[in-house]
């Protein structure tokens, strides 16, 4: 048995890529995309027809160049999602423009638009997750969307405050980041060597997983952003793990049965009162790593969105 097969026996394996060939190879249940992955996928020759289709679509919708650009990038993200849905049995995560991360209403409207594009292509809501950054405003948007039957994946999650607020909002799924937490600790503590069990990102996801199970929250925990296979092995048993093709290939190449590391068997506890906005900011901002990584993550996704726009503009 490969380690990948062993992992699949206890955790839903998700592919963190927009590369259709990689998805075919590893046969994940679900797939996740983001602006950075859409940008790199768009450079692959097999995606050219999807880009052409997105541009043709945008031109039928508006004469305004700015609106055409917005429509083209939304349609391209959905087109890539549609191709991926042909080869996975589960859900695709498609991300809202990161530049809307602090605007609740704009996030809601963008999510509805993406869902409408999927619906028009014959895809029902139960196969889609709308990815939103885990800002206070993003979490409030997700709360509204969940009530409309639009399931959300709250990403760029680094703090306990973010995790708690997501569960309290009834969000379908969260993506707590592992590797980026490790990156911050390596850069800021001077320590470079972390065994997987002491990896701060692994510890963070483990704590969130246990908190959710302890308080009987239904929100799915999907560990994300891995730097090495050992982090993944240390989180075997997590609800879901979204993994890059490179690390999926390492797991597939290694034989052996994994030990389940995450499994809650303790007593259930009463849920606390939901966090207020001020409590959320106080707790989240008390964690300098979470503050830095959330801001950096949003900026990086926004930067790649702008690169994607530049590429589309040249074709419009």
From Swiss-Prot:
EC no. given is 2.2.1.2
Q: What are the UniProt keywords, alphabetically? A: Cytoplasm, Pentose shunt, Schiff base, Transferase
What subcellular compartments does it reside in? Cytoplasm
Q: In which pathway does it act?
A: Carbohydrate degradation; pentose phosphate pathway; D-glyceraldehyde 3-phosphate and beta-D-fructose 6-phosphate from D-ribose 5-phosphate and D-xylulose 5-phosphate (non-oxidative stage): step 2/3
Catalytic reaction annotation: D-sedoheptulose 7-phosphate + D-glyceraldehyde 3-phosphate = D-erythrose 4-phosphate + beta-D-fructose 6-phosphate
For molecular function, the Gene Ontology terms on record are:
transaldolase activity
Single GO BP term: pentose-phosphate shunt
Where would you say this protein principally sits, based on its record? Answer: cytoplasm
- Family membership: Belongs to the transaldolase family. Type 1 subfamily.
PANTHER family in alphabetical order: TRANSALDOLASE
**Protein name listed in UniProt:** Transaldolase B
